């Protein structure tokens, strides 16, 4: 693709997606020329460009910039920094985006989020082409259909970028990848460019927050709510109130928070934030298995959810009642010890008990799921007693955060090649232990292999199904009360003393 044609296509795309208006065409061309370090261009008349062609158009401009020495390195980190600068030149200013969102929100909050989600893709902040590479499937289990995804949309760092990052002076701007200061930031080799990123202000429970989408989209309309201030994650009464206020304002979305302790929390504990979106997880579909009640809260329907983790579900017409009861449960859990069930509130002054909360609307009612968490470590389980155990690490050894708690496995990219190799070996009868790709999976695969007859047509489906069953085991590991008579009796002991 010729350079001038690529510029014309990019301008056509921006006009089509209403990133720029017809009156801004010349200005936009000049903004691109500046970013590309060009003195001029001659644009062809016809140059339509749809979303599916955008990656090729950007690639053509990046290849040309590298050939001319404008793009210094031709690796993914540097290419991402550069193509984000190009898209940033075509992205409306924050006030325009906020104005459009607020105007639509006054009509209907769903209209506002529909537009904002599409906009976040049109600017290439959410890279549709990379999200499409993620491998996804569902596995039926006793807990319902769990979602499994092998995440391929996060680019791997290249060695040159890692080396360059070591030589950079330390920077605390932006303070983290969630901070509002990311909006419009040019990025560097160890921090993504965000010139095409726009956030919208929201107020939840009287506090100033922002709404944005995750660039990696693990599920439909995967949004992030972030505190305006860079303050640590904190599960408390105000957190419950904010979650329920959010689903009051955006009833078509769920929202939840990662826990506020290491091991059982998410990857970012330093900046208070929630994750939500428009997706129905297996956990939401899971029924209440044991009805329970809390004195003084007869108007709140409560129960233990049929789920591999230990979840109390609360449903009520009034969100204030859920806030009161959730706070009471949290306060009780924070200080609760039951040595016979290996629940220790603290050791050596270090707290262990917390909650992963998820809020949603159930018809007109409000609902809170409270997943009880504990981050105790032991000599046998140094990464966490209620964390994936060592025999499951070949599939999942990372923290079990909010998204996994709800029933969606986010598995590492390495598994795409490894699981394919396992399937090949099961068909061919090859030695699983000799191949570096399959050695870590050998015990697991040899365990389920006798149950099946493998063919080239069915092997991958079987391996995926068994991977999903491992994820169910991973969630069972993270459950503080096991799904045994003893475990459920211990769960009820906690509930009765609340």
PLM feature segments, named:
Residues 1-225, 229-232, 306-308, 323-326, ...:
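Active-site microenvironments that recognize anionic phosphate/pyrophosphate groups
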Residues 262-270, 348-354:
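Beta-rich nucleic-acid/ligand-interaction surfaces
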Residues 238, 247-267, 276-330, 334-337:
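Catalytic or ion-translocation cores adjacent to nucleophile or general acid/base/metal-coordination motifs
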Residues 196-198, 230-255:
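Helical scaffold of the NTase/Pol beta-like nucleotidyltransferase catalytic core
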